[in-house]
């Protein structure tokens, strides 16, 4: 009997250490909750201002814009000096003829304009790539934000479960001391608490990983502490499917870029056809004669692209450009079809997760909470077993986690849908 009492005292001491550790961790978590709130709109502004991927995309746009002037410009003029019949030994001033020339290559009218249009369409495509990168980064930021929320909420639920098991332990210990319960119930509570304590380091690591991803998108130190991510308030998506299709087809940057690619290839095709026309070279010359009168001269030269031995080259260029137009149009149609599919698919997934989250929030969680309270009252009154109480507690915890996972999955799908459609569908954004 004395050994039995010592064993019970040792068990209580161990439980005290575990509970003290749990309470200390819980206090740390409460302190983290009291930090500044992490607001999604402010983070979106930050990622659009600082993310290096976006900085690089904007610089690529700037570079592409500067290619337009280059494409529209003439080649450099050529300054030449010719010496004819220079006496020996070499004396340049006594050459019979010294010719100073200035020449300029002139493409056939319209060629430079078409080259500029091709470069302009390429620059416009790069601009749309910037807008697409902005949407992509906002989507990734939202998903990282809600991943962080899920891990913070998981840790909060973990500490709530520790507190709940502490209460179960106190009930079991009180019943055991009064001779109305079994020491096995006390030991079961100890085991459950130990299992929870083992889970905490893994949860903390996952929270740090989620925070590091968010900081990386914001171009900050991955280990920088973050505030508390806010729980989303899911609102129904009221826009009809046809309206979402119309918005995406009109505003999606990738589709605008595809249309610009068609235009660019059409301009390239027109330029290839213009290669059948000759280019020119004009020159102005000044003649200085050693023992004769000085004078001026000029000439005009013309290329012959329609010679039978060069024309096949230009024929192939036109055929290549025509194939490029066909490819661009096919890719545009493919992207339009993909956009419609993505909207249908994401909207269906979004509504499915909405239904799941609503079912948990309105039915499963209230029922599980009632079941837990009933099991606790029944065990305290001696009408239920401790194992039933533990099973009910596990179910309650699992249902909470599944609810928040469904909620976060819903926000992931919403972010992806907003990326495709091109407008915010969530007021919190």
Where are these regions (language model features)?
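Amphipathic alpha-helical coiled-coil segments
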Residues: 56-71, 133, 137-157, 166-169, ...
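Acidic, low-complexity, intrinsically disordered peripheral segments
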Residues: 2-6, 26-32, 402-429
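Periplasmic alpha-helical coiled-coil/stalk elements that build and connect Gram-negative outer-membrane
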Residues: 2-3, 9, 132-249, 346-349, ...
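Residues that define the transmembrane beta-barrel architecture of outer-membrane proteins
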Residues: 94-98, 294-298
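Short, charged, amphipathic alpha-helical segments
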Residues: 117-120, 183-191, 386-393
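A glycine-/polar-enriched beta->alpha junction
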Residues: 45-55, 62-77, 89-92, 100-117, ...
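Bacterial Sec-pathway N-terminal export signals of envelope proteins
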Residues: 25-84, 105-106, 114, 120, ...
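Bacterial N-terminal signal peptides
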Residues: 11-21
């Amino acid at each position: 009997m004395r050994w039995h009492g010592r064993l019970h005292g040792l068990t209580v001491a161990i439980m005290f250490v575990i509970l003290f550790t749990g309470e200390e961790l819980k206090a740390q978590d409460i302190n983290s909750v009291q930090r500044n709130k992490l607001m999604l709109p402010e983070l979106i502004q930050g990622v659009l201002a600082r993310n290096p991927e976006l900085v690089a995309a904007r610089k690529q746009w700037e570079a592409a814009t500067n290619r337009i002037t280059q494409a529209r410009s003439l080649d450099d003029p050529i300054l030449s000096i010719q010496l004819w019949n220079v006496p020996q030994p070499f004396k340049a001033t006594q050459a019979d003829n010294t010719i100073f020339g200035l020449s300029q290559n002139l493409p056939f009218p319209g060629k430079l304009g078409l080259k500029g249009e091709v470069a302009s369409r390429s620059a416009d495509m790069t601009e749309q790539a910037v807008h697409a990168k902005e949407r992509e980064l906002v989507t990734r930021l939202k998903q990282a934000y809600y991943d962080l929320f899920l891990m913070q909420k998981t840790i909060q639920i973990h500490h709530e479960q520790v507190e709940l098991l502490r209460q179960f332990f106190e009930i079991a210990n009180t019943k055991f001391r009064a001779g109305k319960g079994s020491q096995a119930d006390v030991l079961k509570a100890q085991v459950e608490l130990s299992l929870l304590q083992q889970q905490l380091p893994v949860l903390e690591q996952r929270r740090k990983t989620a925070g590091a991803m968010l900081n990386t998108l914001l171009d900050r130190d991955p280990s920088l502490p973050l505030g508390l991510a806010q729980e989303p308030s899911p609102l129904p998506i009221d826009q009809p499917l046809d309206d979402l299709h119309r918005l995406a087809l009109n505003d999606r940057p990738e589709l605008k870029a595809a249309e610009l690619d068609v235009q660019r290839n059409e301009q390239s095709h027109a330029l290839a056809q213009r290669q059948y026309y000759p280019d020119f070279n004009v020159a102005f010359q000044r003649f200085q004669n050693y023992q004769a009168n000085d004078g001026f001269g000029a000439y005009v030269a013309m290329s012959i692209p329609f010679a039978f031995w060069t024309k096949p080259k230009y024929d192939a260029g036109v055929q290549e450009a025509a194939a490029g137009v066909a490819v661009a149009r096919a890719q545009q149609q493919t992207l339009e079809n993909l956009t419609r599919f993505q909207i249908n698919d994401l909207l269906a997934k979004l509504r499915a997760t909405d239904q799941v989250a609503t079912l948990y929030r309105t039915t499963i969680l209230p029922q599980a909470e009632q079941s837990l309270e009933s099991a606790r009252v029944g065990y305290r009154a001696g009408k239920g077993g401790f194992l039933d109480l533990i099973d009910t507690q596990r179910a309650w915890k699992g249902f909470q986690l599944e609810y928040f996972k469904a909620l976060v999955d819903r926000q992931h799908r919403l972010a992806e849908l907003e990326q495709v459609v091109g407008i915010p569908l969530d007021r919190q954004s």
